[in-house]
Amino acid sequence: MTRIVFMGTPDFSVPVLRTLIEDGYEVVGVVTQPDRPKGRKKIMTPPPVKAEAERHGIPVLQPEKVRLEEEIEKVLSLKPDLIVTAAFGQILPKQLLDGPKYGCINVHASLLPELRGGAPIHYSILQGKKKTGVTIMYMVEKLDAGDMISKIEVEIDETDNVGTLHDKLSIAGAKLLSETVPNVISGNIKPIKQDESKATYAPNIKREQERIDWAKPGEEIYNQIRGLNPWPVAYTTLNGQNMKVWASEKVAAKTEAAPGTVIRTEQNGIVVASGNSTALLITELQPAGKKRMKGEDFVRGKNVQPGDVLGEANEEN
């Protein structure tokens, strides 16, 4: 039986690990990130992959840095025939890449060489793409640059956000892995080199990318809002206070109002002017210190009036 070490951390990785177990491989160990403090109370919380591994009685390693010699030895002592990674969050050192006889393969949530890096799902929506997918490739020491083994395309719906697209890609990635691993083991594959000239990158989201610039066209802001939902969430300001914007809808009507101006309130939210004479309807938001709410509840509370301007004054945390 093929001995596999799985490396992954967030929810995306869980169906991938589960597939390996269900397909009957001997998952001899799981490597994931350390437990981290979570929420307002900073409660130490295990990564989703750790919880899944423990449910199946699989040994778990949680190195802060997998590149350290002692951590490499721990992984190799498990004698893996194959290492499979999915959203692990660390680049593997050469000793690990060279260890297993079938190599190391990675399940990456984009159609490589596009969107290499840690936030491919976010960027596929932020950039307004109509499709993305999952690529399984051999791992090398360079970020997401190894030879590609298999791919699957996934359509991005107009209403998808990072959460819904994440779930689609996670399921697609698990299915693709189930089809790919037997071919990797048998050698029945023809890996394809990535075209470096077509490589693009999806680095982790920075704080400045979360702030809405109302001078941008409505389509771009619409993609920003859904491309940051459910994490880290786009924000603007109202009366000097930060306000998270969870969801919006495009508005067909043109406007000559200055970007950021509240044009009108509607039953299900507020219509805000954006760049190029466009506008957006904010349908779900979260004022500072309050719970997430529907736009209709915000309007009912008379929290905003036509003529108010979003995006001015305080733009810090």
From Swiss-Prot:
Protein name as catalogued: Methionyl-tRNA formyltransferase
GO CC terms of this entry: cytosol
InterPro entries registered for this protein in UniProt: Fmt, Formyl_trans_C, Formyl_trans_C_sf, Formyl_transf_N, Formyl_transf_N_sf, Formyl_transferase-like_C_sf, GART_AS, Met-tRNA-FMT_C
Keywords on record: Protein biosynthesis, Transferase
Entries under PANTHER family matching the protein: METHIONYL-TRNA FORMYLTRANSFERASE, METHIONYL-TRNA FORMYLTRANSFERASE, MITOCHONDRIAL
The keyword Transferase is annotated on this UniProt entry: yes
Origin species: Bacillus velezensis (strain DSM 23117 / BGSC 10A6 / LMG 26770 / FZB42)
One Pfam family of this chain: Formyl_trans_C
Source organism, top-level taxon: Bacteria
EC number(s) per entry: 2.1.2.9
Family assignment from sequence similarity: Belongs to the Fmt family.
Keyword Transferase: yes
GO molecular function list: methionyl-tRNA formyltransferase activity
Role noted for this protein: Attaches a formyl group to the free amino group of methionyl-tRNA(fMet). The formyl group appears to play a dual role in the initiator identity of N-formylmethionyl-tRNA by promoting its recognition by IF2 and preventing the misappropriation of this tRNA by the elongation apparatus.
Binding site for (6S)-5,6,7,8-tetrahydrofolate: 110-113
Reaction it catalyzes: L-methionyl-tRNA(fMet) + (6R)-10-formyltetrahydrofolate = N-formyl-L-methionyl-tRNA(fMet) + (6S)-5,6,7,8-tetrahydrofolate + H(+)
Location of the region described as Disordered in the Swiss-Prot/TrEMBL record: 292-317
NCBIfam families linked to this entry: fmt
